[in-house]
From Swiss-Prot:
G4 as annotated region, ranges: 600-603
UniProt-annotated binding residues for GTP: 500-507, 546-550, 600-603
Location in or out of the cell: Cytoplasm
Pfam families according to UniProt: EF-G_D2 (PF22042), GTP_EFTU (PF00009), IF-2 (PF11987), IF2_assoc (PF08364), IF2_N (PF04760)
SUPFAM superfamilies named in the record: Initiation factor IF2/eIF5b, domain 3, P-loop containing nucleoside triphosphate hydrolases, Putative DNA-binding domain, Translation proteins
Region (G1): 500-507
Family from the record: Belongs to the TRAFAC class translation factor GTPase superfamily. Classic translation factor GTPase family. IF-2 subfamily.
Annotated Basic and acidic residues bias: 97-113, 125-175, 339-349
Taxonomic source organism: Leptothrix cholodnii (strain ATCC 51168 / LMG 8142 / SP-6) (Leptothrix discophora (strain SP-6))
Name of the molecule in the record: Translation initiation factor IF-2
Amino acid sequence: MAVTTVAQFATELNRPASTLLEQLQHAGVSKASASDPLTDTDKEKLLAYLRTSHGTSGADRKKITLTKKSTSEIKQADASGKARTIQVEVRKKRVFVKRDDPTGASSESHDSQDVQELSAAEEAELQRREEEALREAEALRRQQEEEAAQRQRAAEEQARQEREARERAEREAAERAAAEAAARVAAEAAAALAAAEKAAATAPAPAPVAAVVPKAPAPAPVVAAPTLAVASLGAKPVAPAPTSGMRVIKAADIVAGEAQKQIDLDKRRKAAEAEAAAIRAMMAAPKKVMVAKKPEEPKPVVPAAGAVGKDGIKGTIHRPKTAAGAPAPGAAPGAAAKPGEKKSVKSEKLSSSWADDAKKRGAAAPASKGRAPDVRGGWKAPGGARGGRRGDRGGAVSNFTPPADVQIHEVHVPETISVADLAHKMSVKGSEVIKQLMRLGQMVTINQQLDQETAMIVVEEMGHKAFAAKLDDPDAFLEEENLAEAGESLPRPPVVTVMGHVDHGKTSLLDYIRTSRVAAGEAGGITQHIGAYHVETPRGVITFLDTPGHEAFTAMRARGAKATDIVILVVAADDGVMPQTKEAIAHSKAAGVPIVVAINKIDKPDSNLDRVRSELVAEGVVPEEFGGDAPFCLVSAKTGQGIDTLLEQVLLQAEVLELNAPQEALAKGLVIEARLDKGRGPVATVLVQSGTLKRGDVVLAGQSYGRVRAMLDETGKAAQEAGPSIPVEIQGLTEVPSAGDEFMVLADERRAREIATFRQGKYREVNLNRRQAAKLENMFENMGQGAAQTLALIIKADVQGSQEALAASLLKLSTDEVKVQIVHAAVGGISESDVNLALASKAVIIGFNVRADAGARKLADGNDVDLRYYNVIYDAVDEIKSAMSGMLAPEQREEAIGTAEIRTVFVATKIGTIAGSMVTSGLVRRNCRFRLLRNNIVIYTGEVDSVRRLKDDVKEVKEGFECGIKLKNYTDIAEGDQLEFFEIKEVARTL
């Protein structure tokens, strides 16, 4: 059992501790202070004492109930979202029951059990009361939310009613004010106009007539109607009399609303007064005044200081006639206006025709007919019942707003554009463009294509600025897209082209580098097959282009793309600088790439290094030891001496050039060579210049496109990707691309197909549109101004003097129509590099006292390169002149072949009209041309359809024989007509 003190027990009983101590003393329990402990036995003694003291029998079973209250707080959110605190009071009861047990132990156990039961009951009661308190709090919250919603709805409804009443009152007041103002203004204007007309009719002609300025009415009547309306509106009962605090608040709100409405009405009243004053000032000017005829050159009217009347409107009074700048005696009276305004002058100018018309009708007509002049004020009276709107034309400021400035557009015109697109660019209708083209003499439809020149003329004729746009090529933005997608640039391997004379060891040098650097077991022929390979060295990777690289090098230079970074110039130590070496130097300098000189065959005993250096210096290749920029390497393709040094020099040049390319981007590069394989289809060898080419990418190369189905490296093995400066062989293109074409990877196959299709039909469409737009005057202007044709030549001679003389003689043959271009001129035999150069430049090779070697002849035969050999310079000049003549357009000439006389005309069934003729001279052939002469006058020119001799079709009939001639599409023939036969032959022109 829990032990409590006297003070705690007194608190439970709600009694003072001193009273409880006295009762305990009387009950026989000795407790000295309130802090003494109090046991259950002591409590039972106290209970027995109290029962006996209050007359209760101890034998009766009674119970004592102790009540304890506890208060707690619960936070609950209401409808507005704010937290509300709810007080929860919990009352606990503890009941003590005295039981009569035979023994004290059993009594104690029963008491413990009773206390536990009472504790459980108290807990259940506590839980029930808490739930009840929560339910009450929830009900209270819902009730508060409903009350708040009802109050809000009531407030909104009341506000809506007040707003509608206020708007209705304002609307009625404004309408009344406007009606009254309009009525007053109309009456004033009519009176002023009548007075002005009367004054003008009665006044003498030479005396100046003063302008009639009507007095402005007092503003009080204008204010009266709105004020009365507001007062009457305020007198209406809006709500019942306030009977509670809430009603008092609403009445105060209504009073505040009425005050606000009064303020708004005052503002509107002032605005209406200002508007009415402006209307009166505008209408104050005389609309129809009889004026004397003005002189031819009247002086401008100079108004005096405006006199301000009582109504606040400024007027203008003319000076006397003698004053400087005064008008003529017969001048019209000036209109009343504010200083600085030009309304009177403008209205006078605008209404001059109206005033003249009124003068023609006569000013005394209304009086003669007996009409009152002040009823309507003339047909121009602004305030009349029927002429109110027309009167504004006379003196009011015109509402006409001048048109805004025409906006001039900058139109970028592509090569071809439709009429609809051109109109859209100029922000005009398509019909306007069609009309403009009709004025220019061209009939078009809205969807018809226009060439760039015609479109630019139309744009300029319509007042806009025309600019020639770039080609509307869909791949024009590919470069920008690739630049935008390019990632970080990283170092890439250099691309090296080996050039030089074939006898100087170029092939042997490449073979040694390949066999020493490529892993064992790889087929060497594959590298030759794809034309490019790369070599791994301790210092980096080098990509070599084989002999076809010379051709690709030239083609790439023509396209402006440099695939070659470094050129290795191979020179034999025993031969020195040969003519083909000079060609290689010229190609390298034209492309702007550095040269690394490899002097080969240093192991031969007859090598002369000093002579080689001096010859190279003479050609402009200065070694580094002489202060130049070309490194010289002494190598031997036979022993391998100096190969490592050569590769190091190449890599050193690459480091100086800082060759970088993005790797994490779409691939882009060049087509080195391409062929059509019987089993695999189009196969192209490409050199990746930037990005990474992966299997499955969509490739666009020239006019061909496709998805990479297979990719092989230089060893013939399948590769999944290729980085910058790596050559690979790809399959999957739609057709064979051209060598030297740029290729790029696109993200969308549909876009690649569109670009390839556009490239195929681009020039065809442009030419078609240009032919369609050609006109007769343009044809006359362009006659004789066509682009001159060019004959490219490569000259190889035995000696320098012969080469210079032949080149000078051939250059003198150039004319305005055909020009001679010397691509290359040198001394020596015709080699493979010459044939490659001729292929790239489409030139003719001329050998003067020299011949081509076996390799060059084979290459020339395989690629249809024209080789010409001459021993006499005049023969060379004559043949080149004949070739230039063959490039000229042939001349058409008529050649008469015979004549015939028509002796009879008959009609054959299923054949038509037949001319029975006698061949009088020459002969007549089937399908030849003829002229029909009647009385020695040519009446028709046509073609012979067929010729018959004795019922047999023949090709020709000679002189002295009769034949039947059927003319094609012509039957108007008669006996005695003459037929003249001729043929048109093309004759070659000569220079």
